[in-house]
Amino acid sequence: MSRALDPHTDFIPRHIGPTAADQEKMLAAIGCGSLDALLQEVVPPAIRSQGPLALPASRSESDVLADLKAVAGRNRIYRNYIGQGYYGTHTPNVVLRNVLENPAWYTAYTPYQPEISQGRLEALLNYQTMVADLTGLDISNASLLDEGTAAAEAMTLARRGSKSASQVFFVSAHCHPQTIEVVRTRAEGLGIEVALGDEAQGLPECFGVLLQYPHSLGGVADYRALAEAAHAQGAVVACATDLLALALMTPPGEWGADIAIGSSQRFGVPFGFGGPHAGFMACKDAYKRNMPGRLVGVSKDAQGNPALRLALQTREQHIRREKATSNICTAQVLLAVMAGLYAVWHGPDGIRRIATRVHRYTAILRAALTQLGIKVVNDTFFDTLLLETGVATPAIVEAAVCEHINLRRVDGARLAVSLDETVTAADLQALVNVFAAGLQKDDLALDIDAHDAAAPGGIPAALQRQGGILAHPVFSSIQSETDMLRYLRKLADKDLALDRSMIPLGSCTMKLNATAEMIPITWPEFALIHPYAPADQSAGYRELIERLSKALCEITGYDDISLQPNSGAQGEYAGLLAIRGYHRANGQAQRNVCLIPASAHGTNPASAQLAGMEVVVVASDANGNVDLDDLRAKLTQVGDRLAALMITYPSTHGVFEESITHICDLVHQAGGQVYLDGANMNAMVGVARPGKFGSDVSHLNLHKTFCIPHGGGGPGVGPVAVRSHLAPFLPGVLNAQGKLGGETGIGPVAAAPYGSAGILPISYAYIALMGADGLRRATEVAILNANYVAARLRDYYPVLYAGRNGRVAHECILDVRPLKDSSGISAEDIAKRLMDYGFHAPTMSFPVAGTLMVEPTESEGLAELERFIDAMIAIREEIAQVERGERDRDDNVLKNAPHTAQMLLAEEWLHDYPRQQAAYPVASLRDAKYWPPVARVDNAYGDRNLVCACLPVEAYA
């Protein structure tokens, strides 16, 4: 067939920024003849793959979308009344279109640079305010990964805050079953004993208690006396709860809970076969400095204006490392933003109306089922009824299946039904008809109004919420869609995301999130599948998971993989648990030491600690590589206690260490396993396969290498891939009842069987669109772009580390430490000045304090690279002006950066440089200028005066 008739597949050059001509120019500039020659210089021969990946060729966008549509069509959308922590919801269309589908929101990074993140920080502050208000507690964080992991985090927070010497954590049998299993997994690694029981029978001696309010199967209990009893023995009370129910029920903070956790999924976020959804945690003020996850706080900027920032960061894993009590890094920012905006959209009256409608429909259903002769076990309820259906259970289930209805199958003689905001009167009638058919009775025609008038409510008077909800004006100020649209635009305009400019963050891989990859995630066939629906309804998801798993195993060289971990840190944790389980199965439980290089990501030592391992740090040599002499000494020192070496490759210093295979051999000879952190996999896809050059296990960051967007701090997916001997110890997969089915090595690490399955189509689409050749080319160009930036900037800023032939991998570290002595200018000053040039800063002070790490990714074209390079060169000249004494050391464009419009329009200008230099340091900014909404934020003030809820409107006057 003529090539003119070949399908048009142009995705690869759309994803890869530099054109072929640009690549030639760049190669010439760095003194290299070809991309292949560059790889020969950069990648050690011992690890280089000898052949292409066994993956299909690149396909067109239309072909891949048609393929995914066919896969999605194999899922079967049923009416879901399963509940169990996952509920039907209506995503407001204005939020769907302008947030979830808007790259201004989904391509942003975690808001470490607050001056260019004020929009999403405000949206997250709304979320925190909403959660704290509804739970009746003092402070909320900005999201956790899901309800199950939030419960596990509550357990560790309780242990830190408890006055009890006990190692027992009591978990109510009324909790969601998947929550119980995730808590058990976490407890086992930490040496905590989980006592599962009915709290009505009394509490054992324990350091903490986890309750469910309302119960998983519907009941609503008054926990006041129980909370008092727990506190009397020094225990901390944690409560898993439902935000919608709390619109009508007494908040946990009022009846004695110290911590409240749960999922905000039903606030506008679809099922997605289990995720992603934003977990939440709120707590009393006394626990705030130990609370896990990001925390948005209010501070002020250099002009005295209110400004938001991430607060209390010194408690987090990237600071505390092995002393951290949580490994949370990426959370669920995009989903938390959606949930908070759901509350803004509906307002307090709307939320109460939704909750009341759900509750009244449940009361009507209870009355109708009682009329049919079904025993409803629980007299108290919000939205869930437990039914004794006895021998009629199979017939009722069959009748439901015939009507495409899912009920919760508790056991062979009981069913449960959970209602939600999507239920209509017609749905209620269909549900009643199903039970009548299963009982072989005539249909019962519902008179909704009559039943509503007669049916008693399910919330006891003593537990009915008194007073209003969502009192802050932000939840009452939006009246029309026009108002909402403009509010969302105002927030988005405050932020700098990939839709505006390159985000050169080292070790973060801020690459293109192509529109074609994003489209399938909102299709109903993917969005509306309940994670605990019968397996025959998720055939499409299972096929997608199988295909993606095989592709990732081929890319990495491993034998098996779990897609369950819903962040990179959770992938690390799961991988270390697999190693721990493997050693224990071999009768070597004493192997509990994890060696970690000093340059490792902060999540590495934090994850090792959570997995019950002792961390021993291995030094780096002068070239930034693992110090082999120190490694040998540490191997000798720990002896048969060695569990693993956890190493990032290419290293966090941005180089391919030549000795990696030798390092793996040394660890294996000592009886340990090699954990290779896959955070930098973007430098190896199609070029090297860690499972084939000595590693035993890796996690991948699908939100880095495989194009799931960062979402401003989540969602993420962190699959853990292993060689065959570790496969039996991958995370356990829960069955339809949310329990572990059969034998398994370890328990689950996430609440849903396949974690954040709803965003897996993104990575599948990326791999299919790129094909084997495109994936390799992406790696080649990522390495080219990094080396080009390093070569162009080397005369202005020393490049701290390089591999053989003076090359870097996919990122480079610019050493700006000498400038501190010569000019008083710090890495932070350069980072803030880059905002005036329209750029997000590189990674600051990691892995080396006082430096900047740059990762351009393959998606940035030559023009954008040159714009960044020009900015960095111009900034170096601005520093030189200070060094030469032409500008004041304390009053200069860097120390005062970023410059807001308010600063530049001030009537008096008292600075030692012209306004023009502050605003337009390069001519190109006159055509497209991003204005930071706030001046430099005062971090210390924010931590000294901690406020983590919305300020009164007057504060902004």
UniProtKB/Swiss-Prot annotation:
InterPro entries: GcvP (IPR003437), GDC-P_C (IPR049316), GDC-P_N (IPR049315), GDC_P (IPR020581), PyrdxlP-dep_Trfase (IPR015424), PyrdxlP-dep_Trfase_major (IPR015421), PyrdxlP-dep_Trfase_small (IPR015422). CDD domains: GDC-P (cd00613). Keywords: Oxidoreductase, Pyridoxal phosphate. It comes from the Bacteria. It catalyses: N(6)-[(R)-lipoyl]-L-lysyl-[glycine-cleavage complex H protein] + glycine + H(+) = N(6)-[(R)-S(8)-aminomethyldihydrolipoyl]-L-lysyl-[glycine-cleavage complex H protein] + CO2. Its EC number is 1.4.4.2. GO terms for biological process: glycine decarboxylation via glycine cleavage system. The modification N6-(pyridoxal phosphate)lysine is found at K704. GO terms for cellular component: cytosol; glycine cleavage complex. One of its GO terms (molecular function) is glycine dehydrogenase (decarboxylating) activity. Its cofactor is pyridoxal 5'-phosphate. Belongs to the GcvP family. The glycine cleavage system catalyzes the degradation of glycine. The P protein binds the alpha-amino group of glycine through its pyridoxal phosphate cofactor; CO(2) is released and the remaining methylamine moiety is then transferred to the lipoamide cofactor of the H protein. The glycine cleavage system is composed of four proteins: P, T, L and H. This is Glycine dehydrogenase (decarboxylating). It comes from Bordetella petrii (strain ATCC BAA-461 / DSM 12804 / CCUG 43448). The gene is gcvP.
